[in-house]
Amino acid sequence: MLLSKITFFERFEQDILSGAKTITLRDETESHVVAGQILPVSTFETDRWFCDIQIIDVMPVKLTELTDVHAEQENMTLPQLRSVIAEIYPGLEQLYMISFVVL
């Protein structure tokens, strides 16, 4: 079943709205989106809507395969990105990279 909305931590809101963050890394349960799909975006903490995004692509990627390019698309350094992923998805190796644009 396709996701009908997506949430982000509030700390990422400005990066998303400014276009600095153009991907999100998710686990398998949050990977059910397709290119072209439009999703409302809300904050994880309070479920407050702040924009809509259009999905560009969804690709599997392993934690060990993450590069500086992925980190740049997340508007972070690679060590910061790995730390955030470990905090959100402890012990998870298989991730899904969802590319998007803000509408």
From Swiss-Prot:
Protein name: N(4)-acetylcytidine amidohydrolase
Domain ASCH intervals: 7-93
Taxonomy of the source species: Bacteria, Pseudomonadati, Pseudomonadota, Gammaproteobacteria, Alteromonadales
CDD domains: ASCH_yqfb_like (cd06552)
Cellular component annotations (GO), alphabetically ordered: cytosol
Chemical reaction(s) catalysed: N(4)-acetylcytidine + H2O = cytidine + acetate + H(+); N(4)-acetyl-2'-deoxycytidine + H2O = 2'-deoxycytidine + acetate + H(+); N(4)-acetylcytosine + H2O = cytosine + acetate + H(+)
Alphabetized UniProt keyword annotations: Hydrolase
Highest rank taxon of the organism: Bacteria
InterPro entries found in the cross-reference section: AC4CH, ASCH_domain, PUA-like_sf
Family in the record: Belongs to the N(4)-acetylcytidine amidohydrolase family.
